[in-house]
A protein has these predicted regions:
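Conserved class I S-adenosyl-L-methionine
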Residues: 246-256
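Conserved SAM-binding loop of SAM-dependent methyltransferases across substrates and taxa
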Residues: 257-270
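Mobile active-site "lid"/loop adjacent to the S-adenosyl-L-methionine
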Residues: 326-356
Length: 428
């Protein structure tokens, strides 16, 4: 017999219940047995809070329903004493911020550390707020909402974000929404972006922000940049490259706006070559180098890395013109796969770019290589790198294995929240 609960009800299969008990936060479309109104007759509406029950009547938790999505329910609590009201979300926001306080350097801010004014404040399921991403850049929050449940909660959660930070002495006064992701169509949501003009929010004159990370400055256009603006998940990995770069000639592939390359230059690299297929990204990377006074030791090339690396291996004159030979190569490609169906193709892509990089490295040289897709597991990435090493006839010594920064926490039971791997090797 089901216990009395205040919300409409979703009854799920035994398999779904096992998954929820193991900590996974999603109920999929095919796992729903039936849906029922609440005890008071309240019907289910898209994005509302629902109670989730196993067929035997056991309560599994409460979540937000997405009636247009294959992910039908995203869980928000397994505590039967929780009531999903404004106070509930206030606690979630406060917990998320306090975690950043602890994990990213205590109370030394503005931002998260003395040399940094940015961090990820909310990381969706990992912070108990499924469908919500919040990045903090100095005085501005940049948000991305990906579910209908969070879309409905914007008027509740946005003021809580500002209030939580301001009560902690943080100079945060504005929210910029980047709800222009095509993925919103899966939830039946429109795309839009712009300043949120709700309770307690200011509207700055410009969407440009000066981001400081690891003591380096980046001129960021939050209106037109990728996703929520800056890839904050690589912060400590960039610092690791800085520590390795002293006296070396560095090739930064898929450089975006230059954060890996600038960290290498700041770490005392003899020379850094940054490469990206986007001319806009290259121009921004060069501008950021000038902003930090590092441009004299850096060069910038607009090229397709998948073609550029083999060309350097074939043409030693071009290699010298580009600043080589290089003894540290950084590979930070975009996600090669966004679904299980393309993992095999992605593995081939990772194998090819790592093979091409290994061909350029001398004995004693270093390779820092990344993957940012949770479908490409750590084991699959290592297998692709091992295959590349075999093909290149080199032996690798693993120096370090890292993941995403701690402001992107990994929720155990939800492998989707572990998506970034960063591996450093030396050719021996």
């Amino acid at each position: 017999m089901k216990q009395a609960r205040p919300y409409p009800q979703v009854v799920v299969t035994r398999k779904a219940a096992r998954s929820l008990k193991a900590g996974h936060p999603w109920v999929f479309e095919g796992e729903v047995v039936r849906m029922e109104p609440a005890a008071d007759g309240t019907a289910i509406s898209n994005g509302c809070v629902v109670d989730v029950f196993e067929e035997n009547g056991t309560w599994q938790g409460a979540g937000l329903i997405s009636q247009n999505s294959k992910i039908r329910v995203r869980m928000v609590t397994r505590n039967a004493n929780d009531r999903i009201d404004e106070a509930f979300w206030a606690r979630r926001v406060a917990w998320a911020w306090q975690h950043r306080r602890v994990a990213m350097g205590g109370r030394a801010l503005p931002g998260c550390e003395p040399d940094t004014n940015c961090c990820r404040m909310v990381f969706s399921e990992a912070d108990g707020m499924p469908g919500l991403i919040v990045d903090r850049y100095e005085h501005v929050l940049v948000t991305q909402v990906g579910t209908v449940g969070m879309e409905r909660l914007r008027p509740v959660i946005y003021p809580l974000l500002l209030k939580t930070l301001q009560e902690d002495g943080q100079n945060v006064c504005a929210i910029y929404e980047r709800n222009d992701s095509p993925a919103r169509a899966k939830e039946g949501l429109p795309q839009y972006k712009g300043w949120w003009q709700g309770e307690g929010a200011e509207v700055p004159e410009t969407p440009r922000i000066m981001v400081v990370e690891n003591g380096l400055k980046f001129d960021l256009d939050i209106e037109n940049s990728q996703k929520t603006g800056f890839f904050l998940d690589q912060k400590y990995n960039r610092r690791a490259v800085r520590e390795l770069a002293g006296g070396r000639r560095v090739l930064d592939c898929f450089c975006h706006v230059g954060p890996f390359g600038l960290n290498a230059a700041a770490g005392g690299a003899e020379f850094v070559r940054c490469v990206d297929v986007s001319q806009t990204a290259i121009d921004l990377a060069a501008a950021n180098a000038r902003l930090n006074g590092l441009d004299t030791s850096m060069g910038f090339t607009c090229a397709n890395v998948l073609e550029y690396l083999p060309e350097l291996a074939r043409d030693r004159k071009r290699l010298r013109e580009e600043g080589g030979p290089f003894d540290l190569i950084v590979l930070d490609p975009p996600a090669f796969t966004k679904s299980r169906g393309t993992v095999e193709h992605a593995s081939k892509g990772y194998r090819e770019i790592n093979y091409a990089a290994m061909r350029l490295l001398p004995r004693g040289g270093y390779l820092a290589t990344c993957s940012c897709s949770h479908f490409m597991t750590t084991e699959l990435l290592k297998r692709a790198i091992a295959d590349a090493a075999h093909q290149a006839n080199v032996q690798l010594k693993q120096i370090e294995e890292r993941q995403q920064a701690p402001d992107h926490p990994i929720l155990w039971g939800a492998p989707e929240t572990h998506y970034l791997d960063f591996l450093t090797f030396q050719v021996v």
